[in-house]
Amino acid sequence: MLARSVELFNDRGFDGTSMEDLARHLGITKSAIYHHVSSKDALLGLALDRALSGLERAAADVRTMDGSAVDRLESLVRRSVEVLVDRLPYVTLLLRVHGNSPVERDALARRRKLDRFAAALVKDAIDAGDLRPDVDAAVNSRLLFGMVNSLVEWLRPTSTHTASDLADAVARAAFDGLRSR
């Protein structure tokens, strides 16, 4: 039920989807939906948690890693790509919320914590001399994770690209550059 609901939220927008639309899409009654969740917002919360829990787990793993800040940052980028590929519809939905409800605001607060962690890693890597100092750490972080997040715009579940291949491509482009040597 959750996966099919997220599919509809991504197609129509969360605010543009009614419980009646969900029931029709799922082929069940509204009361059957309410048997499982208390509201459309509760359903949204479950979906956003599916995306955020994977991203938070990736960040927690990176926090405990040994190694340089740039190595940990690269690991965070790779893990974020893997989560995005594995949970594509859920991450797509997460990237489309704007804070219109308490559920959305909670998700955005959780996402901001992840953003701050990534920006701190970028700053530490700059301070260590492993990343260029001529671009602000927060800007670098936004650009880096903007590249990761842009995958939701073109990646399809039927894609032949594996999570590992995409993680390698993003990491190479971000950390080694696009220019041939």
Segments from the language model and where they lie:
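Hydrophobic alpha-helical connector segments
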Residues: 46, 57-86, 141-144
